[in-house]
Amino acid sequence: MLELTTQDIQLQQHFANKQAAIQGLAHALTAKGLVAEGYAQGMLNREAQHSTYLGNGIAIPHGTTDTRELVKQTGVTAMHFPQGLDWGDGNLVYVAIGIAAKSDEHLGILKQLTRVLSADGVEQALQQAKTAQQIIAIIKGEAQLTADFDASLIQLQFPASDMVQMSAVAGGLLKNTGCAENEFVADLVTKAPTHLGRGLWLVASDRAVKRTGMSIVTTANHCEYEQQAVKALIAFSVCNDVHQPLLNTITQCVFEQKQDQLLQADVQQLLNLFSGNAEQTIAQRTIAVGTITEETIAAETVAEPDSARAHTATFRIKNSHGLHARPGAMLVAEAKKFESNIRVSNLDGDGQVVNAKSLMKVIALGVKHNHQLQFTAEGPDAEAALQALGVAINAGLGEG
């Protein structure tokens, strides 16, 4: 059976319009010896008759019955358009598969496509794919498109008395649902959780992870960690980026100081809270398929800036309690207003450089009163971003 392989896919393609893209696909089919000259016109004629857009960011340009004699051998070629290509009627295509069909051997690929056309998150995953292997996995339905989170990953009012117990239970839930193995649980209990405010904590690990998932554990007992209240722990097992929609919900709760909404929710309310944000995020095309390392857990990663084009600014934090959840969220919200890649380091800390648009990473910098933050921005609005961040910091990040 004919199958799409990694050798068939051309990444990072850019065309002015779909007609130019179709001609590019026809040229690739010709170069592979699959079709004779003139097949491109047949593909264009077919597109003029009826759009070959299937849905979920996928199109399948092919010839007409009149051009079948130009097909030397049944085969395919594919192109990836990370910026999206207008295919008409408001449809954006991220992967176009050019088909040269001499018989019905190509039906296997079409059968694969029908399985992903109705799946949530496919279009966003194709947009964000970085490798041919990722695209193949998406088309075959093998890629994880959403993080695992259901009632089996929620444990409310567990009688825990310390953070080790909380981490063990949270890790156990992820292990028992097939997201991770025993080594993950052992690693999780050694991690130092991040306090998100009002007794809500977060911890994550990518050790021995099979699927990305999230668990939530609340405690029925009085519990403290580093002299701060512990009411709930959110744990992530991470092997790709599909947990980002869940992190967006958490970030929004912290930014709006609505941790209590999460802490007081029952199982169904928690499921509704996180599924609602996932749907919104899908609509905004933020789901990504990729890998994540231990150093980038719970953070959106950005490329290292080019020092020749980057802009740098240093600001001193005036907040008496440093960057805890509220001012930290305000800082991240300001950074997210800009397109530029923005990284930040605490010059009075360990000097680690992190993504300024990730609340978890910013809080983890341990910024205290009078610490200096150095921001590096690269992009079309880099100078404006640094200026706005300076204004926000000098204004107290919502704390006056």
From Swiss-Prot:
Alphabetic keyword roster: Cytoplasm, Kinase, Phosphoprotein, Phosphotransferase system, Sugar transport, Transferase, Transport
Highest taxon, organism lineage: Bacteria
Keyword Cytoplasm: yes
GO molecular function, one term: kinase activity
Residue ranges of domain PTS EIIA type-2 in the record: 2-142
InterPro entries membership: HPr-like, HPr-like_sf, PTrfase/Anion_transptr, PTS_EIIA_type-2_dom, PTS_HPr_His_P_site, PTS_HPr_Ser_P_site, Sugar_PTS
Matches recorded under SUPFAM superfamilies: HPr-like, Phoshotransferase/anion transport protein
Annotated NCBIfam families: PRK11109.1, PTS_HPr_family
Comment, domains: The PTS EIIA type-2 domain is phosphorylated by phospho-HPr on a histidyl residue. Then, it transfers the phosphoryl group to the PTS EIIB type-2 domain. In contrast to classical PTS systems, the fructose-specific PTS has no requirement for HPr; FruB combines a IIA domain with a HPr domain.
Protein name (record): Multiphosphoryl transfer protein
Species for this entry: Vibrio cholerae serotype O1 (strain ATCC 39315 / El Tor Inaba N16961)
